[in-house]
Amino acid sequence: PYEKIGAELVKEVAKKTDDVAGDGTTTATVLAQALVHEGLRNVAAGANPLSLKRGIEKAVEKVTETLLKGAKEVETKEQIAATAAISAGDQSIGDLIAEAMDKVGNEGVITVEESNTFGL
């Protein structure tokens, strides 16, 4: 039963990450698995679960604060292309995404669909 709860938790973390960020599901899954594993290990060793939860929440706040301090605005078409290329692992896809974003603007919507036809 505990394994199923853990699996459902990790699945929910991946889904939420995909819904909110659209990327980072692997990282979120690895972090969730580590938190569950270490949390259970600490509880088994006698740690108070509520104290662990509070500690995790404080750590999340600190990590969020640190990430936000180091975050940089992506504003130019070149920055968008570079960021998208890293995410896609392909510079040509990064360039296509930057071009699409340039055309639709900040409030526009871009829909990407998988195709079985090469080049279309």
From Swiss-Prot:
Its EC number is 5.6.1.7. It is found in: Cytoplasm. It catalyses: ATP + H2O + a folded polypeptide = ADP + phosphate + an unfolded polypeptide. It holds the Pfam family Cpn60_TCP1. Keywords: ATP-binding, Chaperone, Cytoplasm, Isomerase, Nucleotide-binding, Stress response. GO terms for cellular component: cytoplasm. InterPro entries: Cpn60/GroEL, Cpn60/GroEL/TCP-1, GROEL-like_equatorial_sf, TCP-1-like_intermed_sf. The keyword Isomerase applies. ATP binds at residues 23-27. GO terms for molecular function: ATP binding; ATP-dependent protein folding chaperone; isomerase activity. It is an enzyme of class 5 (isomerase). One of its GO terms (biological process) is protein refolding. Gene3D superfamilies: GroEL-like equatorial domain (1.10.560.10), TCP-1-like chaperonin intermediate domain (3.30.260.10). Forms a cylinder of 14 subunits composed of two heptameric rings stacked back-to-back. Interacts with the co-chaperonin GroES. Together with its co-chaperonin GroES, plays an essential role in assisting protein folding. The GroEL-GroES system forms a nano-cage that allows encapsulation of the non-native substrate proteins and provides a physical environment optimized to promote and accelerate protein folding. Belongs to the chaperonin (HSP60) family. This is Chaperonin GroEL. The gene is groEL.
